Amino acid sequence: MAKGQSLQDPFLNALRRERVPVSVYLVNGIKLQGTIESFDQFVVLLRNTVSQMVYKHAISTVVPARNVRVGPGGGYVQSNEGNQAEDDDVEQ
């Protein structure tokens, strides 16, 4: 698995498992809302009134509606609607 996906997959999986509502901002500025139904290496299946397959390369930001615990010992990802989500425990 690529190093860039070591946080991405657990984050998306936690959102999917807990059915957390998300706002997905695309690189063209469009905002999509729903819950993550499924995902793979290239796409995210976003569910609202319909299911939408969104290519990951088109996604800029994923903002959860509430805090989400990522991974077994991971920190919380906080929701800042309108701002990019932040992870408390990320070390620089």
From Swiss-Prot:
This is RNA-binding protein Hfq. Residues 9-68 form the Sm domain. Pfam families: Hfq. RNA chaperone that binds small regulatory RNA (sRNAs) and mRNAs to facilitate mRNA translational regulation in response to envelope stress, environmental stress and changes in metabolite concentrations. Also binds with high specificity to tRNAs. Belongs to the Hfq family. Residues 73-92 are annotated as: Disordered. One of its GO terms (biological process) is regulation of RNA stability. HAMAP family: Hfq (MF_00436). SUPFAM superfamilies: Sm-like ribonucleoproteins. Coiled coil: none annotated. It comes from Xanthomonas oryzae pv. oryzae (strain KACC10331 / KXO85). The keyword Hydrolase does not apply. Keywords: RNA-binding, Stress response. GO terms for cellular component: cytosol.
